[in-house]
Amino acid sequence: VDLGLQERFERDGYVTAPLYGQQELRALSGLYSRLHRDPQQEFFPSTYSGNPEYRSIVDREIRAITETATEGLLYSTQLRYASFIAKSPGPRGVVNVHQDMTLVDESAFSGINIWCPLEPTTQNNGALQVIPGSHRWIETYRGSTIRGIYDNLRSQIQARTMPVYLAAGEAMIFDQSIIHYSPQNFTARTRVVTNVFFTRR
């Protein structure tokens, strides 16, 4: 375990690290293409699909690849759920400033995602933007039906975010309570990432 990564994670709420090699990227890109014959519209997390068989296939296949890829990176953890997140071109793919849903008791643990693009993220295709250290601002409880406490300050908060540009297969490992957003994808291609939630074993 890289203690330097752990220290930066606790301070900033995120770290970046290599995750997938070319073989894994080809397998994941192929999986996405097979399951998505039609172009996705807007912002599409596979988690929100109403098709349980589709969700199960995505979860199983991504986790199988990611479990091998995280050996030596994570210690005593278990991958719980995996998904694709697709950001299509255009303004309807913008994801506003937010924090992810609360999935663990954050008074004792950190809920953590491994977010990894299948192609490089840039200023043109909606790279993830964060406020380092914002996971330590205020303890919050978050859910899909709970209004975010920062909703009235979105424009001010967005101005304080910084982009995190990643290579294909390079992961951003982040605390689910960190403030983040992703701007418009101005390219002609859908930007696809894998997102994996994990906990202590």
Predicted features and spans:
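Short, conserved beta-strand element in jelly-roll/cupin
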Residues: 105-123, 197-200
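Short, structured patches in soluble enzyme cores that scaffold and shape functional sites
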Residues: 83, 99, 116-120, 132, ...
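A short beta-loop-beta micro-motif enriched in histidine and acidic residues
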Residues: 75, 98-111, 159-160, 166, ...
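Conserved hydrophobic/aromatic beta-strand scaffold that supports enzyme active sites
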Residues: 14-16, 113-117, 161-163, 171-173, ...
